[in-house]
Amino acid sequence: MMRKKEKVITMTVTLILVVILICIKVTHFVIIERPLKQCRIVSAYHLTVDTNGAQIDQSWLFEKDDLTYIDIAKTFEQTYFVTDYAGGSGDSGALNELTIAFGETMDGMPDIRITVSENGYIQINGKRACPLSLKYAGNRLYGHLLECLQDGADRQQ
């Protein structure tokens, strides 16, 4: 009798854990992955800053209606991990950053803004993203973002 009761408790706990894991996966997909993939990219620019954080150059890659996921994915692929140090006397050079803004709120601000520096430093902020600043494994983030962007490109065709 006691063994049967233990078995029922074990099965119940296992079932509850499985349901929780499924809920977490569904929530992750619905809240995090899907909205990002379905967001329209509203702006992207390539920024070069010196080691003190001063802006050297900023070139807009795309703005508003001219954006396509294919173009931004190609540009991201070409500009990220490119060592393009601006020569400076006695200076260690400059870092390239690529900023991509997804979506747009009523006040014209992007829902999510992701800035990737060539040294692997990532900043994510915006109304639909928790403010986040981290040193990330650059290749993994680059791959994940490119997949999201290419997935959006497939939907646009």
Language-model features: where?
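Function-determining sites in protein domains
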Residues: 2-157
